[in-house]
């Protein structure tokens, strides 16, 4: 039976923020959410988050998730003291297979595969996740015996000069038999330079009890990087985005510049996708085969089908784009926009909660809201569907092959029949019959002999 304890009680003073440190984001998600996500992939019996500073805000952000519980550390007296607060909630089954994995809410990118390796390295004993660093300043050192076995971990402030020369460091992440961990946590002391209860002291206790201590290393160095400042947060953000870019490149996506590419959710791409510079992908985004995304676009929870083009500076949110459709430049698709195949939505066109069927076009300067637009419809520049009466929204229906002249207002609820034409400048307040020209502008007249006024002296 696997328990996961995530330490998330820290103040995060160096972040210079009122927001609890573990709620600061990485790739659009709270750091703690990344850790919980990795832990869930191990299918633990229980996840216990130890909270302290900003406990109510942290709990509010995650409360209600199945299998997730909270323990309060108040005040904070070190990592060992933090895990002690979770002890009453640890589950135990048949004994030997009961294990507790300790993770950190501010070390957000440790991957499930690395954690699986750590659990395997444990055998029937304890395992720690270690890293070899060129500069190990500030880290706890891994001390090994003459046989190369881990015998203890010494914190930097308590280390001798010889120990400080060690390059293998403790990441803080460990796995231990649950029953023994409970015993060791009851035996650790705060007799150290910091006056705190160190979780790392359980390693020395394990060795003293004859329990083997194994070690595993992460698949990549960025997996064990922690965040204690805005600088470190920014550095880790770039490291993670670089990794996400690498994965897309290896999957066959062309990125104009991998250093100017941001994913803040999940991005799934087909074959031969091209993504230009400065694009941001949020939520769940799917790009079909041959899709091209121009520079500086933002796509949030969007599905784009094969062969479509999203031109520069377009913003799409909760929208669908059909095959070979063209969006932009400078277009905005709001929630509920659904574009059919080969449809065109051009510059400064906004579409919300509307369907635009195959081969229809709104190429310039239009607002289409709460509308059902058929196939092969042309929407002229300056067209507005007037969908809101101040209280309720109303729908506009434009049937197949209709032609909407420029500078037209359609006051919903209203219907334009199949093949109908609306003359430029029309304000439509009643249904327009199929196949007919409907026009409502005033008749043009010329006033002969009219003179412009002149400025009085």
From Swiss-Prot:
One of its GO terms (molecular function) is glucosamine-1-phosphate N-acetyltransferase activity. Its EC number is 2.7.7.23, 2.3.1.157. Mg(2+) binds at residues 106, 228. Pathway: Nucleotide-sugar biosynthesis; UDP-N-acetyl-alpha-D-glucosamine biosynthesis; N-acetyl-alpha-D-glucosamine 1-phosphate from alpha-D-glucosamine 6-phosphate (route II): step 2/2; Nucleotide-sugar biosynthesis; UDP-N-acetyl-alpha-D-glucosamine biosynthesis; UDP-N-acetyl-alpha-D-glucosamine from N-acetyl-alpha-D-glucosamine 1-phosphate: step 1/1; Bacterial outer membrane biogenesis; LPS lipid A biosynthesis. The keyword Protein transport does not apply. It catalyses: alpha-D-glucosamine 1-phosphate + acetyl-CoA = N-acetyl-alpha-D-glucosamine 1-phosphate + CoA + H(+); N-acetyl-alpha-D-glucosamine 1-phosphate + UTP + H(+) = UDP-N-acetyl-alpha-D-glucosamine + diphosphate. It comes from the Bacteria. Its main location: cytoplasm. UDP-N-acetyl-alpha-D-glucosamine binds at residues 7-10, 21, 73, 78-79, 104-106, 140, 155, 170, 228, 334, 352, 367, 378. Residues 252-457 are annotated as: N-acetyltransferase. Residues 1-230 are annotated as: Pyrophosphorylase. GO terms for biological process: cell morphogenesis; cell wall organization; lipid A biosynthetic process; peptidoglycan biosynthetic process; regulation of cell shape; UDP-N-acetylglucosamine biosynthetic process. InterPro entries: Bifunctional_GlmU, GlmU-like, GlmU_C_LbH, Hexapep, Hexapep_transf_CS, MobA-like_NTP_Trfase, Nucleotide-diphossugar_trans, Trimer_LpxA-like_sf. Binds 1 Mg(2+) ion per subunit. Residues 231-251 are annotated as: Linker. Its cofactor is Mg(2+). The keyword Transferase applies. One of its GO terms (cellular component) is membrane. The active site is at 364 (proton acceptor). Keywords: Acyltransferase, Cell shape, Cell wall biogenesis/degradation, Cytoplasm, Magnesium, Metal-binding, Multifunctional enzyme, Nucleotidyltransferase, Peptidoglycan synthesis, Repeat, Transferase. Acetyl-CoA binds at residues 381, 387-388, 406, 424, 441. This is Bifunctional protein GlmU.
């Amino acid at each position: 039976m696997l328990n996961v304890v995530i330490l998330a009680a820290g103040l995060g003073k160096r972040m210079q923020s009122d927001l609890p440190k573990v709620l600061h984001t990485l790739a659009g998600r709270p750091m703690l959410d990344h850790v919980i996500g990795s832990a869930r992939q191990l299918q633990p019996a229980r996840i216990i988050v130890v909270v302290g500073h900003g406990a109510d805000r942290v709990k509010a952000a995650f409360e209600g998730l199945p299998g997730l519980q909270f323990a309060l550390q108040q005040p904070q007296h070190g990592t060992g003291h933090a895990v002690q607060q979770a002890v009453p909630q640890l589950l135990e089954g048949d004994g030997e297979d009961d294990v507790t994995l300790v993770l950190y809410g501010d070390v957000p990118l440790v991957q499930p595969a690395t954690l699986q390796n750590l659990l395997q390295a444990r055998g029937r004993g304890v395992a720690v996740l270690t890293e070899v660093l060129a500069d190990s300043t500030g880290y706890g050192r891994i001390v090994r015996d003459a046989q190369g076995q881990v015998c203890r971990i010494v914190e930097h402030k308590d280390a001798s000069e010889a120990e400080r020369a060690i390059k293998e460091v403790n990441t803080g992440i460990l796995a231990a038999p649950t029953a023994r961990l409970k015993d060791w946590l009851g035996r650790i002391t705060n007799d150290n330079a910091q006056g705190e209860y160190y979780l790392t002291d359980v390693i020395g206790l394990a060795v003293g009890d004859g329990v083997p201590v194994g070690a595993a290393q992460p698949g990549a160095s960025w997996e064990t990087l922690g965040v204690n400042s805005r600088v470190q947060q920014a550095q880790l953000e770039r490291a993670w985005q670089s990794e996400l870019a690498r994965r897309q490149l290896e999957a066959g996506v062309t990125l104009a510049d991998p250093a100017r590419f941001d994913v803040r959710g999940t991005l799934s791409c087909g074959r031969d996708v091209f993504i230009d510079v400065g694009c941001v992908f949020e939520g769940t985004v799917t790009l079909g085969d041959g899709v091209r995304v121009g520079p500086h676009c933002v796509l949030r929870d969007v599905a784009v089908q094969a062969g479509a083009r999203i031109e520069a500076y377009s913003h799409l949110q909760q929208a669908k784009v059909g095959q070979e459709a063209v969006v932009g430049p400078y277009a905005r698709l709001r929630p509920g926009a659904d574009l059919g195949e080969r449809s065109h939505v051009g510059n400064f066109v906004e579409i919300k909660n509307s369907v635009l069927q195959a081969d229809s076009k709104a190429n310039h300067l239009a607002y289409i809201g709460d509308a059902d637009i058929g196939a092969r419809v042309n929407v002229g520049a300056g067209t507005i569907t007037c969908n809101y009466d101040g209280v309720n929204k109303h729908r506009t229906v434009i049937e197949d092959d209709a032609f909407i002249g420029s500078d037209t207002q359609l006051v919903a609820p209203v219907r334009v029949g199949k093949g109908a034409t609306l003359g430029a400048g029309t304000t439509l307040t009643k249904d327009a019959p199929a196949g007919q020209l409907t026009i409502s502008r005033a008749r043009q007249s010329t006033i002969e002999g009219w003179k412009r006024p002149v400025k009085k002296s």
